Regions:
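Metal-dependent phosphohydrolase cores
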Residues: 2-179
Length: 179
């Protein structure tokens, strides 16, 4: 049983609000260039991999999955680093969380339930991540639980919660701000 099984939804919403405030704070700090460099060094093997680069061919909302994954990864890295968490796992898991190699909108046309992508793609992403990279158990949890609460399995680690929230913040940004 995960520690997150004990928390009510209100507490998770409060955490979401706190992470949003922390995000706004960390973006304005002067050491952004140094942090971007640190982040890139942690994930450059993934960013340069031929299979991962294929994500540039698939759309997310208003951008490519590649760009979305980079944003989620960097935001997760910044929050995890600021809170003293495993920022390397957050950065790598955040980058690999949507590592599926198909156009989900085309698939949605043929999906009778019109909902399977949201529940299945974390496991497809994990399978791809394990095929091309070394993935530890924390990164596995990050990848498979990033769709919480759409998927009912609760995140096991605090870094998984950070990536899940970062994914939602990034999707909102892409959908609303960049529309």
């Amino acid at each position: 049983m995960s520690i997150f099984d004990q928390f009510p939804i209100e507490l998770l919403l409060l955490l979401f609000s706190l992470f949003t405030l922390l995000f706004a704070y960390t973006i304005q700090r002067p050491s952004t260039h140094l942090l971007r460099t640190q982040h890139t060094l942690l994930v450059e093997d993934i960013l340069q991999h031929d299979q991962f680069l294929k994500l540039k061919e698939y759309r997310h909302h208003t951008n490519h999955i590649y760009d979305h994954a980079r944003r989620v990864s960097y935001l997760s890295f910044r929050i995890s680093k600021a809170l003293g968490m495993d920022y390397q796992a957050a950065a790598r898991g955040g980058l690999l969380h949507d590592f599926f190699l198909y156009d989900w909108r085309e698939r949605k046309q043929y999906d009778e339930k019109r909902s399977s992508h949201g529940k299945e793609h974390p496991f497809i992403a994990l399978e791809n991540a394990k095929t091309y990279f070394s993935v530890n158990s924390l990164e596995e949890d990050i990848i498979t639980k990033h769709m919480f609460p759409k998927t009912l399995a609760l995140p096991r680690y605090k870094e998984s919660v950070v990536v899940s929230i970062s994914d939602k913040i990034s999707a909102i940004y892409e959908y609303v701000v960049r529309a």
